[in-house]
């Protein structure tokens, strides 16, 4: 019986090709096959380093159906690498279903660490980094996005979001409206690329800067927002404690309303939290 292969989770550059580590290059040269979110994009990356390996497209629309086929290959002894278009796989990218299936099948899954836009942005933000929460992409529809932000408005940890260029201005507007215009934040754009910018200030000033500069609405964005003040965080914590007790005896909406009246915490933050 053959020894099962290994699934390597390989981080790739988010912009600067010099950030692909020697170990990552070695793994990509030697694996049996590479699973890639976009094979065309990955083929260009491999060509830059003179690497030629078979590629298999693995993305959000086919991951659930391909996972079993890939696991079969791993069990038979093949070694595979999983890459995304940029950065560390699984972070707001496909791969979770495959990794879960591989671990369930007893396959060794090992990380090949490297670039990550959220960590890169946090490291240069100047905002507290000892505790943070990553929310990925906010909902595209305005109502759903505002609801999500309302539930996060009193989160005490530093908040990190990804955002697309065509939504960055309206996202900052919603953040300033819901979190408060004076909340400190950072907008990191095109990290490690030629036109990299890292803007800091209040949500109000950042919204104005981005709205008034076409160049600041191009590229890929990471938004980092300072957590809520301790007083707000204490209110929401107490509100959720009271809400949990009241919910045992009242409908959720009524429990949230009463808990908000008792503690001063926002009702929506309790009902959705």
Swiss-Prot record:
InterPro entries with a match to the protein in the record: 4pyrrol_Mease, 4pyrrol_Methylase_sf, 4pyrrole_Mease_sub1, 4pyrrole_Mease_sub2, rRNA_ssu_MeTfrase_I, RsmI_HTH, SAM_MeTrfase_RsmI_CS
The protein's enzyme class: transferase
EC nos: 2.1.1.198
Domain of life where this protein originates: Bacteria
CDD domains to which the protein is assigned, alphabetical: RsmI (cd11648)
Record keyword Cytoplasm present: yes
Record keywords, A-Z: Cytoplasm, Methyltransferase, rRNA processing, S-adenosyl-L-methionine, Transferase
Family annotation (PROSITE patterns): RSMI
GO molecular function, one term: rRNA (cytosine-2'-O-)-methyltransferase activity
GO CC annotation terms, alphabetical: cytoplasm
Catalytic activity as recorded in UniProt: cytidine(1402) in 16S rRNA + S-adenosyl-L-methionine = 2'-O-methylcytidine(1402) in 16S rRNA + S-adenosyl-L-homocysteine + H(+)
Keyword Metal-binding: no
Location relative to the cell: Cytoplasm
Pfam families for the chain: RsmI_C, TP_methylase
PANTHER family: RIBOSOMAL RNA SMALL SUBUNIT METHYLTRANSFERASE I
Family per record: Belongs to the methyltransferase superfamily. RsmI family.
Biological role: Catalyzes the 2'-O-methylation of the ribose of cytidine 1402 (C1402) in 16S rRNA.
Record HAMAP family: 16SrRNA_methyltr_I
Protein name per its UniProtKB record: Ribosomal RNA small subunit methyltransferase I
Organism of derivation: Xylella fastidiosa (strain 9a5c)
High-level lineage: Bacteria, Pseudomonadati, Pseudomonadota, Gammaproteobacteria, Lysobacterales
């Amino acid at each position: 019986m053959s020894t099962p292969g290994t699934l390597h989770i390989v981080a790739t550059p988010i912009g600067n090709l010099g950030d692909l580590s020697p170990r990552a290059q070695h793994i990509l040269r030697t694996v049996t096959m590479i699973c890639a979110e976009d094979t065309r994009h990955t083929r260009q990356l491999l060509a830059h380093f003179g690497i030629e390996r078979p590629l298999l497209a693995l993305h959000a629309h086919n991951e659930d159906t391909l996972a079993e086929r890939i696991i079969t290959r791993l069990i038979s002894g093949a070694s595979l690498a999983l890459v995304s278009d940029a950065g560390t796989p699984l972070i707001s990218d496909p791969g979770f279903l495959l990794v879960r299936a591989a671990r369930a099948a007893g396959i060794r899954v090992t990380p090949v660490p490297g670039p990550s836009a959220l960590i890169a942005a946090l490291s240069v933000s100047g905002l507290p980094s000892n505790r943070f929460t990553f929310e990925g992409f906010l909902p595209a529809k305005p109502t759903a996005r505002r609801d999500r932000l309302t539930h996060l408005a009193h989160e005490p940890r530093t908040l990190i979001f990804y955002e697309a260029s065509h939504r960055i201005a309206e996202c900052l507007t919603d953040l300033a409206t819901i979190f408060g215009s004076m909340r400190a934040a950072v907008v990191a754009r095109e990290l490690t690329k030629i036109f990299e910018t890292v803007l800091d200030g209040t949500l109000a000033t950042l919204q104005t800067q981005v709205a008034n500069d076409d160049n600041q609405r191009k590229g890929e964005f990471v938004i980092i927002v300072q957590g809520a003040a301790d007083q707000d965080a204490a209110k929401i914590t107490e509100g959720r404690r009271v809400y949990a007790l009241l919910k045992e005896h009242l409908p959720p909406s009524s429990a949230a309303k009463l808990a908000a009246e008792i503690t001063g915490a926002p009702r929506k933050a309790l009902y959705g939290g």
